[in-house]
Amino acid sequence: MDDQATRPTAATSPVLVIAGLTGSGKTLAIQQLEQLGYTGLEGIPPDQAVYLIEAIRPRHPALAVSLNLHTPEYREQFLAFDRWRQAQGIPFLFLEARPLVLLNRLSAHRRPHPHRPGLGLLEAIEQEVRDLAPVRERCTHLLDTSELNSQQLRQQLQALVHGIPQPLNLRLVSFGFKYGAPPDANLLFDVRFLPNPFFQPHLRHLTGQDPPLQEFLFADPVTQSTYRQIFSLVQAFWPHYRAERRPHLTVAIGCTGGQHRSVALVERLAEDLRPWAVPTDNPALPALNIQVQHRHLLDSQRELEARFGPPPPAAGVEQQQVRIPLAGVPAPPHD
């Protein structure tokens, strides 16, 4: 991709060029941009794009051009067009989505894939990803539409054309490997090597949300070291996802059943990332919209009760949150 320090922005250019994978939402993006005041041109071969842009933009304050890159000839023409685009300082948005998402979207149309009509649908999708990889590398803005509906796509485009930074939707998921890992995880951590509260009878029926279990787990040096490394990686990675205008980042942490260790680490991670969570007084600052999901917590609890019976009655004493400080991890802000 173009260097971020020198890339042109849609907020300062009257023209926006769009390309992307079939099914990623190029047509919908043009429609949404037209509602934002743009004149839209769709399916333009690269060798015609320069002429059309130069002919139309003097009469239109904002112009969005979606390129047709389905044939090898068009992809060869793109290189010459892109040299002109860069010289003009025109931003270039590339739309993509995960292959299985594209498969589901395109299956509803029940027609051959326009990129490689002779191939099976999934095979054609995977081939298009490979064919357009050099095009993707030249974009100034990258948008993954896998989890966007039309309204969310409009919000992302509106933020793009107005130069408004958007919060990254950071989804923190705990899960149990015995039930299956989440298929949409961007970062996945296996913490089954940590001390297992299941083998502590007084902790077995608790969850990673309970302070006694958290205290037991985070008193262990290996847990502390593991958590620090997970926190450091997530803290280092999420700004780059946001800089590339990816709307979502899913971080999954798994243990055996998804009740104890993974839940405790996800809860702690959400707490420690709070200083970067929205709302923020300065919209230009990096910001997160943190969502927590304990994917298999109830499944594990039901299975545990079926095996060992219901949990013992609570002692009736309110549990106090115990937070063991860890070096290299910031303390949460005071409310």
UniProtKB/Swiss-Prot annotation:
InterPro entries: P-loop_NTPase, RapZ-like, RapZ-like_N, RapZ_C
Annotated keywords: ATP-binding, GTP-binding, Nucleotide-binding
Organism: Synechococcus sp. (strain JA-3-3Ab) (Cyanobacteria bacterium Yellowstone A-Prime)
Annotated family: Belongs to the RapZ-like family.
GO MF, one example: ATP binding
Methyltransferase in keyword set: no
Name under which the protein is recorded: Nucleotide-binding protein CYA_0911
Residues reported to bind ATP: 20-27
Pfam families: PapZ_C, RapZ-like_N
